[in-house]
Amino acid sequence: MHKKIFVIPSWLRASHLILVCLSLLVAGAQPASAGLLEDLTDGQHVLLMRHADAPGVGDPPGYKLDQCSTQRNLGEMGRQQSVLIGRWLTAQGLSSAKIFSSAWCRCADTARLLALGPVTIEPSLNSFFDDMSLAKSQTTALQTFVAASLKAYPKQPLILVTHHVNIEAFTGRVVAVGDMVLARVKPDGSHVSHQVFPSPRP
């Protein structure tokens, strides 16, 4: 008894190869974090972001929040970094977001350069670097704000641009300039868990 040998036509082999290549191309075009947009629209997550690169530490003596020239501000690298972060977020599927920022100019400028929507100054995101005794009250205020914002905008991505001390107090995580922390929270706004997304660099 002879075994039958089936020969796949060359045109069919070529078609299969094309389909495989197309599948690989589509897979390669997917965002680096396919679930980021989904998480940010489930009413349980917020994206905390440390402001982009601003040379120096702290602020000059006598600085004023309503005068950017008296503060430590973004450098050219920080401005480029902010734009890259915005592009990265767009690549994850975010076309717009509710964006809130600390009153410090380096935070507000970072937020605006994301180009994902209007920026609203939110006091609970303000730094307490100058007075660490405010850490607990400021973090409690942030939790209250997060809870209220998620209730008001449950289906919109919520981006909060702030400072390293605020992010560490809220999540327990130390982050570099421009880094993002996707935080899952309880209904009262308190932290449950988080995932860090390192900032793209110029």
Regions found by a protein language model. Name each.
Residues 92-94, 149-155:
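Glycine-rich phosphate-binding loop signature in dinucleotide/nucleotide-binding domains
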Residues 35-123, 128-131, 137, 173-200:
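Active-site-proximal alpha-helix that buttresses catalytic centers in soluble enzyme cores
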Residues 141-151:
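A short, acidic, amphipathic alpha-helical segment used as a generic capping/interface helix at domain edges
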Residues 1-12:
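N-terminal secretory signal peptides that target proteins for export/translocation
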Residues 15-27:
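Bacterial N-terminal signal peptides
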Residues 44-46, 154-162:
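Generic beta-sheet signal
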Residues 29-34:
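Boundary at the C-terminal end of the N-terminal hydrophobic targeting segment
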